[in-house]
Structures are given as C-alpha cells and as structure tokens.
C-alpha cells in the first residue's frame, strides 16, 4: 500500500469515528433532556405537596410563593 492509500484509509477511519461520536452525543443529549424533564416534574410535585401543608409552606416561603 502506498502512502497516499494509507493516508486515505486513515482519513476514512477518522471521518467514520467522528460521525459515530457525533450521532451518539446527540442521542445522549436527548436522553439527558428527557431525564432532566422528568426530574423537574418530580421536584415540582414534591414542592406542591410541601406548599399544601402550612408548616412546610411557612418554612419554604420562597418556593411556595410567600415572597418577602
């Protein structure tokens, strides 16, 4: 194999690796966004539960809308 052919093979491997890595990162970003959204909803449900109880709402006024 000549140097030119070896260089072309090297560039093809680099290109293939870059494409696979890029698409994997995008899929991972989508999974992270979905997990983050689910966590945000769970936190919101917990805060609403706290705000429904007077004792907890009094302690966490900044979360329950009892601003200063």
Swiss-Prot record:
Cite the entry's keywords alphabetically. Acetylcholine receptor inhibiting toxin, Amidation, Disulfide bond, Ion channel impairing toxin, Neurotoxin, Postsynaptic neurotoxin, Secreted, Signal, Toxin
Disulphide bonds in the chain = 50-56, 51-64
Q: Highest lineage ranks of the organism?
A: Eukaryota, Metazoa, Spiralia, Lophotrochozoa, Mollusca
Q: Which residues carry this modification: Cysteine amide?
A: 64
Q: What does the UniProt entry state concerning the protein's domains?
A: The cysteine framework is I (CC-C-C). Alpha4/7 pattern.
Q: Does the keyword Transmembrane apply?
A: no
Full protein name: Alpha-conotoxin Lt1a
Which residues are annotated as pro-peptide in the record?
Answer: 22-48, 66-68
Q: Name one GO molecular function term.
A: toxin activity
Record's description of how this protein is used: The fluorescent analog of LtIA (LtIA-F) is a highly selective molecule targeting alpha-3-beta-2/CHRNA3-CHRNB2 nAChR that could be used as a molecular probe for the study of the structure, function, and distribution of this receptor in live systems. It displays a ~4-fold decrease in potency towards alpha-3-beta-2/CHRNA3-CHRNB2 compared with native LtIA without a change in selectivity.
According to its UniProt record, what is one Pfam family this protein matches?
Answer: Toxin_8
Q: What else is known?
A: Negative results: does not show activity on alpha-9-alpha-10/CHRNA9-CHRNA10, alpha-4-beta-2/CHRNA4-CHRNB2, alpha-4-beta-4/CHRNA4-CHRNB4, alpha-3-beta-4/CHRNA3-CHRNB4, alpha-2-beta-2/CHRNA2-CHRNB2, alpha-2-beta-4/CHRNA2-CHRNB4, alpha-1-beta-1-delta-epsilon/CHRNA1-CHRNB1-CHRND-CHRNE, and alpha-7/CHRNA7.
The Swiss-Prot or TrEMBL record describes its family as follows:
Belongs to the conotoxin A superfamily.
